[in-house]
């Protein structure tokens, strides 16, 4: 099977073939064309149009940057450069055919002029079966063994997946690139995209007021002077603003991506152009993922003394490969529930040898990023990937933490019928009081249209659940890790995988039933769409302050354990974002502060308070 997209000139010839067997009167009655116009559109006697397009089977594919599956599915790919060929004829300007097959315009005074020709364009591609066991890396490339560490974004050999930037199949690891300063200490998809990425970063800066405020306040002092931060997070425009803020505060940074699909290539290029050693691109393989992390850590003459992690992969890699580095590392800042869980496991086993800050459970992360960010981005991710209408659809959301609450609220507001699964009786009661029906997954799995996981756990959706799903059920994950959906169980010979668009796979059973799997079970919003910049400003500011706190803390303040961000800093982060809304805080009087037993400047709530 092949798909062709043709230009207006080629499309204009379609009605000629259909009209050749009609009399002028029949054509006039059926298409509303004048008899003169029909006669003018008829093919010349003695043969077909010499410029008529060849049969589909004979047309060669046209190479170039617009070809390929991504281009064929892009709205721009089918854009018609001129007015429709089926437009009703103008009484003053009629189309005629030259004897050589070209078009002509007849003006009212009888003058005949040749119409401008459009170049015929074809975009053609053949159906290809996805090979999930094939890696794009060259034969002989060293493999960073899976046994060394299990990634929280384990790709399950997804390197063969198509990505949005697949026009250049050469791996960035095989390219020799330098920025304008002559540095090659980076690895990105294409350094030439830096200018476009810079514009995206500048747009993000407008929605990240707290980080910009930190830059201004740090002009006279550098609280991170001497800090060498190695980071592993999603590389987006918002992350770039954070990295450049850390640089303005005096830190040196090296960065890799925590998710193989969430990197914005143009932003990574802009950071590399600015002198940041960045090792990331969209669509990394499993080997690429660990290679990028290793390039950030294993550097001659440079050793990190701070870690900023999202998912725990960077921390785990250093523990496994370079444990001696922890002698100089002052602390770890972890953003996600998956990474925090791994830190608590290390602490429980007595293997956590530095202080760690749990940003995920800070108020400003839980109550804003997890709730409001997911409430908006879940709809965006589903709409971009599936074009689905939400009204009346039955959806089950696994987990009713802050992420689950945001997803449920958004879908309910769009008219969906929402079910919730939950293990915690407190969260379960909250779901019931919010108007959602609490169920077990196997009770509704046959009837729901969408399954969304947001638990931070593993194997929440098993092969048994997947087998029982209805045809065309959409399955996706809003948690950090790709372990919530048992995707590995779907990579069996009896099931067929078809990539239908970027980050969208149809998994087809032998009886013809199919499910729609989004982002191969990885984080939906950052893999398939984007997230609100303003909310990420809150999280990024929390991360920056956590790094400052751990780096400057006197010896002995923090032991080898996992800590929450001090309440005073949570309140400070929130206060930096209030001016955006022209919000004005009420101040306590001395009498009121004394009555409540509070400092007038905060903190205003005890650590045990639940917002």
Swiss-Prot record:
GO MF, any single term: hydrolase activity
Biological process per Gene Ontology, one example term: S-adenosylmethionine cycle
Any Pfam family the entry gives: AdoHcyase_NAD
Record-listed NAD(+) binding positions: 336-338, 370, 401-406, 422, 457, 478-479, 525
Basic residues bias: start-end ranges: 135-144
Main localization category: cytoplasm
SUPFAM superfamilies: Formate/glycerate dehydrogenase catalytic domain-like, NAD(P)-binding Rossmann-fold domains
Compositional bias annotation for Low complexity: 1-14, 36-57, 68-81, 145-164
Catalytic activity field: S-adenosyl-L-homocysteine + H2O = L-homocysteine + adenosine
Cofactor note: Binds 1 NAD(+) per subunit.
Location of Phosphoserine modifications: 107, 149, 152, 155, 158
Pathway info: Amino-acid biosynthesis; L-homocysteine biosynthesis; L-homocysteine from S-adenosyl-L-homocysteine: step 1/1
Modified residues (N-acetylserine): 2
Gene: AHCYL2
Subcellular location: Cytoplasm; Microsome
Gene Ontology cellular component list: cytosol; endoplasmic reticulum; neuron projection
E.C. number: 3.13.2.1
Protein name: Adenosylhomocysteinase 3
Function text: May regulate the electrogenic sodium/bicarbonate cotransporter SLC4A4 activity and Mg(2+)-sensitivity. On the contrary of its homolog AHCYL1, does not regulate ITPR1 sensitivity to inositol 1,4,5-trisphosphate.
Region (LISN domain, inhibits interaction with ITPR1): 2-109
Binding site for substrate: 236, 310, 335, 365, 369
